[in-house]
A protein has these predicted regions:
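Hydrophobic/aromatic beta-strand elements that line small-molecule binding cavities or substrate pockets
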Residues: 55-57, 86-87, 102, 112-121, ...
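Beta-strand/loop substructures that line and gate deep hydrophobic ligand-binding cavities in soluble
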Residues: 135-187
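Long, compositionally biased interface segments
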Residues: 176-204
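Positively charged n-region of N-terminal signal peptides that target proteins for export
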Residues: 1-4
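Cleavable N-terminal signal peptides
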Residues: 6-7, 17
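Hydrophobic ligand-binding cavity/cleft-lining segments
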Residues: 19-93, 191
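A short, structured loop/turn motif at beta-sheet edges
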Residues: 60-63, 89-94, 119-129, 153-163
């Protein structure tokens, strides 16, 4: 089952119990790098409970500028078209809590969520990277669970390009038709990369 959001986001004043998938960097072949520099994306969906979806792209922009866009939570709908009404509702020592709505095509009703979000620089697979994690706050919204991450790092051989990987594991609490999975694969996932790229162009 699923939910995206971009992706993300998070809220509530409960002590969050974080789900797990450790952020990693997927190695790219030379052919994949060329395709991604031309605007392509790598996308994957794995059925299960939760459903797992991911997208990888390359953006010609500094990592720090892109990470700033990711952490500007109220502005997420400006570049993530499936996400609406994002609001910061609190913070604690570990998280910024945000809530929002993921717009899903008919016949699925929109998904609402609260999440715990945190981001910062880490070393991932030997690379200095920015990592943004998000986890659904149990018992909030109308989804069962959602958790995942973004990883951003500068390509060693092409430092002007930033590798962007988004992974989400999600169970929206309802069965997901095949048509919705196609929408995720062909629309929602690549839209995150193109939207982030366009938002950077607007701001910088």
């Amino acid at each position: 089952m699923i939910r995206f959001p971009l992706c993300f986001v998070i809220i509530a004043f409960a002590l969050p119990v974080f789900a797990t998938e450790d952020p990693t960097i997927r190695e790219l072949s030379a052919e994949e790098v060329t395709d991604l520099m031309d605007g392509g994306t790598i996308r994957d969906i794995a059925r299960g409970t939760p459903l797992r979806a991911e997208v990888i792209g390359l953006i010609e922009a500094p990592r720090d500028e892109l990470s700033t866009i990711l952490l500007d939570y109220p502005q997420i709908p400006e570049w993530a078209p499936a996400t609406e009404d994002v609001e910061v509702v609190g913070t604690d020592d570990e998280c910024t809590f945000i809530e929002g709505v993921t717009k899903i095509p008919w016949p699925i009703s929109d998904r609402t969520w609260r999440m715990c979000s945190r981001g910062g620089d880490e070393t991932i697979d030997g690379q200095e990277a920015f990592v943004y994690r998000f986890d659904h706050v149990e018992g909030t919204g109308n989804i069962d669970t959602s958790f995942g991450f973004w990883v951003l790092y500068s390509l060693p051989d092409h430092p002007e390009w930033t590798y962007v990987r988004y992974v989400v594991n999600a169970d929206p609490g309802i069965a997901i038709p095949q048509a919705i999975l196609r929408w995720v694969t062909n629309g929602a996932l690549p839209d995150l990369i193109s939207g982030l790229r366009a938002r950077h162009g607007e701001l910088y």
